[in-house]
């Protein structure tokens, strides 16, 4: 006999998200999922369907919350470079002290299921496309503001997506902050952010030197 549905399905789905995020699809047994969600098998099947159906809902929930919040970060700052630094800073902090130490549910699922489940892969492709579009927007703002070279291609957004996916995989090895921040610095340097900042600094120093009044002999 199933448990009466006296629970918030969305709240319990969030627990399933965490279970799949940490252990993957194959590594999450139904008994363990029931325990993580705090419900009986009858309630799980009656509310969410079978394991695959639950997993699909968990991935969609993850993309609508964790992924969406990360993507929104890239649009919050008028400065494109500041937005990129904030995004990667949050990613590094999450890897070192949050759930990101499990990697990323999207990335993990690409590795585990993309080759054997085309329907799930299609959902993941949508998530990656949204991230790439958000990166392209930040790059465009940075380029327009002169924060990076004007000829920086918007296709660099795909490169940043690859950097993120690599960091998500690396997260499972418990990397140091120094290593993660070095990766981020290298990625931003590839966009020319450091080069433009250095040039602007030299111009500022030169301008300041030109306006300093000469001291009397």
Question: Model regions: which residues?
Answer:
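N-terminal intrinsically disordered/low-complexity leader segments
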Residues: 1-7, 149, 195-217
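Generic hydrophobic, amphipathic alpha-helix propensity
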Residues: 8-17, 33-34, 58-62, 66, ...
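Helix-turn-helix
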Residues: 11, 19-53, 57
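Hydrophobic alpha-helical connector segments
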Residues: 57, 71-102, 156-160, 204
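Amphipathic alpha-helical packing segments from all-alpha helical-bundle domains
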Residues: 82-85, 118-144, 155-158, 182-185
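Amphipathic alpha-helical segments used for helix-helix packing
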Residues: 83, 98-119
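Amphipathic C-terminal alpha-helical segment
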Residues: 94, 141, 161-178, 190-199
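Hydrophobic alpha-helical segments that form the core
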Residues: 102, 107, 151-170, 182-190
């Amino acid at each position: 006999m199933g448990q009466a549905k006296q629970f918030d399905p969305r709240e319990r789905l969030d627990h399933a998200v965490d279970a799949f995020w940490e252990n993957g699809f194959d590594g999450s047994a139904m008994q363990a999922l029931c325990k993580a969600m705090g419900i009986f098998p009858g309630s799980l099947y009656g509310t969410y369907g079978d394991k695959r159906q639950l997993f699909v809902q968990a991935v969609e929930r993850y993309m609508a919350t964790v992924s969406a919040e990360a993507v929104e970060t890239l649009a919050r700052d008028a400065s494109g470079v500041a937005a990129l630094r904030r995004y990667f800073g949050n990613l590094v902090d999450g890897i070192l002290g949050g759930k990101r130490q499990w990697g990323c549910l999207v990335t993990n699922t690409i590795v585990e299921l993309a080759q054997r489940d085309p329907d799930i892969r299609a959902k993941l492709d949508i998530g990656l496309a949204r991230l790439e579009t958000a990166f392209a927007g930040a790059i465009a703002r940075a380029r327009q503001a002169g924060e990076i070279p004007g000829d920086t291609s918007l296709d660099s957004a795909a490169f940043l997506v690859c950097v993120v996916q690599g960091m998500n995989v690396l997260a499972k090895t418990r990397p140091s902050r120094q290593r993660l921040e070095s990766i981020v610095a290298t990625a931003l340097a590839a966009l020319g952010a450091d080069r433009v900042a250095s040039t602007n600094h030299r111009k500022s120093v030169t301008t300041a030197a030109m306006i300093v009044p000469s001291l009397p002999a």
